[in-house]
C-alpha cells in the first residue's frame, strides 16, 4: 500500500512539475509577447505622434498659406474696389463739371434773352405811353381850339344879333313891347349858344 501511495505522490509531484514548467513556459511566452506588444504599441504611438506632429505642421503650413492667399485676395479686391470707386468719383466729377457748364451756359442765355425781352417790352411801353400822351395833348389842344372857335362864333353871332336888334330898336323906339320881346329872344339865344358850346 505504501508503494501505491508513493506512486501517487510521485505522479502528483511529476504532474505538478510539468504544470509548473508549462506555466513557466506560458508565463515566459506571455511576458515576451506582452513585452513585444508593448514595444510595438510604443513604437506605433511614437510613429503616430510623429505622424501627428507632421500632420499638425502640414496643417499649420496649409492654414498659413490659405490665410496669406485670402489676405492677398482681399487686398486685390480692396484695391480693385478702391480703383473702381475712384474712377466712378472722377467720372461723376467730370459729368458734374460738364453738366454745370452746360447749365451755366443755358442759364446765361436765358438771362440774356429775358433781359432783351424786358428791354424791348420797356421800350415798347415807353413808346406807347409817349404816343398816348401826345395823342391826349393833341386831342385836348384840338378840342380846346374847336370849343374856343365855337364860343367865339357864338359870341360874334350874339353880338351881331344884339347889334341888329338894337339897331332895329333904335329905329323904332316907340315900340316898347317889341323891344322887350327882342331882348328876351336875344337872352334865350345867348343861353342856348353857351349850352351848345359847353356840350362840345
From Swiss-Prot:
Q: Which UniProt keywords apply?
A: Coiled coil, Stress response
Q: Where is the composition biased (Basic and acidic residues)?
A: 13-23, 30-42, 53-81, 88-97, 105-114, 172-183
Judging by the UniProt lineage, the source's domain of life is: Eukaryota
Summed up, the tissue specificity of this protein is:
Expressed in the shoot apex and leaves.
List, as start-end ranges, the regions of compositional bias called Low complexity: 115-130, 186-200
Which sequence ranges form a coiled-coil region, renumbered to this chain? Answer: 52-81
| Residue span of region Disordered | 1-158, 172-200
Q: Where is the composition biased (Polar residues)?
A: 145-156
Induction statement: In seedling roots and seedling leaves, induced by salt stress. In seedling roots induced by abscisic acid (ABA). Induced by cold stress.
GO cellular component terms, A-Z = nucleus
Question: Is-annotated flag, keyword Heme?
Answer: no
Q: Which GO terms describe its biological process?
A: positive regulation of response to water deprivation
Note on file? Plants overexpressing LEA19 display enhanced drought resistance under field conditions.
Q: Which family does it belong to?
A: Belongs to the LEA type 4 family.
Question: What functional role does this protein have?
Answer: Involved in response to drought stress.
> Which protein, by its recorded name, is this?
Late embryogenesis abundant protein 19
Amino acid at each position: 500500500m505504501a508503494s501505491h501511495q508513493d506512486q501517487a505522490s510521485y505522479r502528483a509531484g511529476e504532474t505538478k512539475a510539468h504544470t509548473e514548467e508549462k506555466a513557466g513556459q506560458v508565463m515566459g511566452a506571455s511576458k515576451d509577447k506582452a513585452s513585444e506588444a508593448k514595444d510595438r504599441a510604443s513604437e506605433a504611438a511614437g510613429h503616430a505622434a510623429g505622424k501627428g506632429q507632421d500632420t499638425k505642421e502640414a496643417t499649420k503650413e496649409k492654414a498659413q498659406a490659405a490665410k496669406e492667399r485670402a489676405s492677398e485676395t482681399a487686398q486685390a479686391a480692396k484695391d480693385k474696389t478702391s480703383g473702381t470707386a475712384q474712377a466712378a468719383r472722377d467720372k461723376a466729377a467730370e459729368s458734374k463739371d460738364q453738366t454745370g457748364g452746360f447749365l451755366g451756359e443755358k442759364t446765361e442765355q436765358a438771362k440774356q434773352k429775358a433781359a432783351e425781352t424786358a428791354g424791348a417790352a420797356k421800350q415798347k411801353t415807353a413808346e406807347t405811353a409817349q404816343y398816348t400822351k401826345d395823342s391826349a395833348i393833341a386831342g385836348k389842344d384840338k378840342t380846346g381850339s374847336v370849343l374856343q372857335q365855337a364860343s367865339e362864333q357864338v359870341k360874334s353871332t350874339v353880338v351881331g344879333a344884339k347889334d341888329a336888334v338894337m339897331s332895329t330898336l333904335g329905329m323904332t323906339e316907340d315900340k316898347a313891347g317889341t323891344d322887350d320881346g327882342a331882348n328876351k329872344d336875344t337872352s334865350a339865344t345867348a343861353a342856348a349858344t353857351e349850352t351848345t358850346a359847353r356840350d362840345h
